[in-house]
Amino acid sequence: PQNGYLIRKRVSRKTNVKENNYQYRPGIVYRLGEAFLNYAEALNEYKDERTVREEALNYVNKIRTRAGIRTYTFGNSDAQNIHVDDNQETVRKIIRAERRVELCGEGVRYDDLRRWKEAEKKLNGDMYGMNYSGKDAEAFYVRTPYQKRVYNPAYYWFPIHQSEMDKNENLRQLPFWR
């Protein structure tokens, strides 16, 4: 059943599944929105100064302006702007939230959580979904456990391959992989 959970990113607007009409659309390797968000994140983490935070917010706002939604400002809120506190942690939260929305379904969330060292918090425990076999709306909207995940701290790093270890006797395996 159609439920609104399918993402149509990277699918041509001319594609019509009901009529078995699929249009070609070239793959996207790296989007401008991702570049803007990467740059904004790097700026914010680089230096805790107002001018740097303003520049970071400027790049987040470019994405929001393109989408036609309100932008962020350290000034007053109005019809076009949302006031935010002028500090590094607030801007960090904004950038991370914007990444989650803008890059939804593009396969970057896992690496984001690893880079931010938040994977253990976010990826451990029961994962829930909707009851897909529900025959009506009431049955469908029942949170249903579908997976129990375990995120081991070792997953923050990849192990060094044994062939590389064999080439250099001074090379030591990373923590958790010994």
Please describe what each predicted stretch is.
Residues 1-178:
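Acidic/polar-rich alpha-helix caps and helix-coil junctions
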